[in-house]
């Protein structure tokens, strides 16, 4: 905790932080669909089968709605006054309306011609309403439903929102739930609450959720405190963490440590020489995780691209190197110089990462962490039993698993091991509601499950093991309870004879 207090905290927000700037990470929202991108000039973005440029969003406030116009340009949408109830002409019954496909006078060719002329989606919807022979006969609710359906199809309204834990968790759960182990957003909120994540804490996290849990913890801690991330494989995966767009001050308290070195740290056999035997591409994995351009260029993004070489994440450098290799005049000292610079940069990154690993090992060796969060695709029992030794007494721990059975086994092992109290296995239940005038009801479709949580608190058990008098006193009490007192002899009265 002392080390975390010395590091500089994040700078206070300025009024300009509420406006979109070039290079910021934002989330595009259309209806209930989200996509995280990085704002760059003249960068083509494909979203919901439409492409556009994000140049015009720079300088606007977060939450502004834009309309896609011809040429892929985004223009701020002007607010339009909704028609009042008096001006609406609606029927009272839909039973006489027959869906024969002839109620709409406009054909698909007519609608396509309107799009080619550059007519906005709002005007197309208005023309569809005017050319519908059954629209005025529908009830008011049916008219609203019809308008909403046509707007969703023909109006391209994009809202640019600021990334947050709630938005990113909803985005991942809806688009790629397998990458976050099918963790629902309400389950993530329960994890943050049960784990007592707050500023100034010293937390340990082991997760394989693309960095979503790590980013949620960093957001709640606000750049104060320290987080030690344990990772399997060549390097930590932080694709979702990069979407938050944290400032550099937040990264000063973030450490990583390889999971395969935890046992040596527990047994006291860890040394700096053991880090030299790690794969040398771990620094490259980190760099590729922080770059979002290649991963989100298409809808079908693949998480395996995080192990690519760093040149693939920099198109300009890649084009330069391709030109040099194709032109024979440029071969020679320039090519050797670029390779030398690349090797030196690679060695510098590896040395920095080695120092961060040693700092993380020193923090773990203190064994005074304020909490533990585990949310991985691996079996939770061996992970939790090993990592609990690094947590201070009277501190919370939370384990997430998509299935209940592994957590039941973990629950049993913890009861046998001891050193924990208030063990609780829980599952959150979520149902979405539609809230509209005279039409509020639970939605027909709901999530089947968002995973299970095992939570509890650590307690000190060293004193009980070391003090043998407690055991002897306990055995003495047990012997006294089991022994029965000897039967008393009756005194016979003396008779006079």
From Swiss-Prot:
Tissues and organs where the protein is expressed, per its UniProt entry: Expressed in brain, liver, testis and ovary.
GO BP, sorted A to Z: mRNA processing; tRNA methylation
Comp. bias intervals (Basic and acidic residues): 79-100, 327-354, 478-497
Stated family: Belongs to the TRM6/GCD10 family.
Protein role: Substrate-binding subunit of tRNA (adenine-N(1)-)-methyltransferase, which catalyzes the formation of N(1)-methyladenine at position 58 (m1A58) in initiator methionyl-tRNA. Together with the TRMT61A catalytic subunit, part of a mRNA N(1)-methyltransferase complex that mediates methylation of adenosine residues at the N(1) position of a small subset of mRNAs: N(1) methylation takes place in tRNA T-loop-like structures of mRNAs and is only present at low stoichiometries.
Quaternary organization: Heterotetramer; composed of two copies of TRMT6 and two copies of TRMT61A.
Protein name: tRNA (adenine(58)-N(1))-methyltransferase non-catalytic subunit TRM6
Originating organism: Homo sapiens
């Amino acid at each position: 905790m002392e080390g975390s207090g010395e590091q500089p905290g994040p700078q206070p927000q300025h009024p300009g932080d509420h406006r979109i700037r070039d290079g910021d990470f934002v989330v595009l929202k259309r209806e209930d669909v989200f996509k995280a991108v990085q704002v760059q000039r003249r960068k083509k973005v494909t979203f919901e089968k439409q492409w556009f440029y994000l140049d015009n969003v720079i300088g606007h406030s977060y939450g502004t709605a834009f309309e896609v116009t011809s040429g892929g340009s985004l223009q701020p949408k002007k607010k339009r006054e909704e028609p009042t109830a008096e001006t609406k002409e609606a029927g009272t019954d839909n039973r006489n309306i027959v869906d024969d496909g002839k109620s709409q006078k406009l054909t698909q060719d007519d609608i396509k011609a309107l799009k080619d002329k550059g007519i906005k989606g709002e005007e197309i919807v208005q023309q569809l309403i005017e050319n519908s022979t059954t629209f005025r006969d529908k009830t008011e609710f049916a008219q609203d439903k019809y308008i909403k359906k046509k707007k969703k199809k023909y109006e391209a309204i994009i809202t640019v929102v600021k990334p947050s834990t709630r938005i990113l968790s909803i985005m991942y759960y809806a688009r790629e739930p397998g990458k976050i182990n099918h963790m629902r957003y309400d389950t993530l909120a329960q994890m943050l609450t049960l784990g007592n994540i707050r500023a100034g804490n010293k937390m340990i996290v082991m997760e394989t959720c693309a960095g979503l849990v790590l980013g949620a913890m960093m957001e709640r801690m606000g750049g104060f405190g320290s987080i030690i991330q344990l990772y399997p494989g060549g390097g930590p995966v932080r694709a979702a963490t990069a979407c938050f767009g944290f400032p550099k001050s937040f990264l000063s308290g973030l450490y990583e440590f390889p999971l395969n070195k935890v046992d040596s740290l527990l047994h006291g056999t860890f040394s700096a020489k053991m880090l030299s035997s790690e794969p040398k591409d771990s620094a490259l994995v980190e760099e590729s995780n922080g770059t979002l351009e290649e991963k989100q260029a298409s809808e079908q993004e693949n998480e395996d691209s995080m192990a690519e070489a760093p040149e693939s994440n920099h198109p300009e450098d890649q084009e330069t190197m391709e030109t040099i290799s194709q032109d024979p005049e440029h071969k020679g000292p320039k090519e050797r110089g670029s390779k030398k610079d690349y090797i030196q940069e690679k060695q510098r990154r590896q040395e920095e990462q080695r120092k961060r690993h040693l700092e993380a090992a020193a923090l773990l060796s203190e064994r005074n962490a304020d909490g533990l969060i585990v949310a991985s695709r691996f079996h939770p029992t061996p992970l939790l039993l090993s990592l609990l030794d690094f947590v201070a007494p009277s501190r919370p721990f939370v384990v997430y698993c998509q299935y209940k059975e592994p957590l039941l086994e973990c629950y049993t092992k913890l009861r046998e091991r001891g050193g924990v109290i208030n063990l609780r296995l829980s599952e959150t239940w979520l149902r979405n509601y539609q809230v509209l005038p005279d039409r509020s009801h639970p939605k027909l479709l709901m999530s089947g499950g968002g995973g299970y949580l095992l939570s509890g608190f650590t307690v000190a058990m060293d004193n009980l093991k070391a003090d043998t008098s407690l055991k002897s006193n306990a055995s003495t009490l047990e012997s006294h309870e089991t022994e029965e007192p000897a039967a008393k002899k009756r005194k016979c009265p003396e008779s006079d004879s």
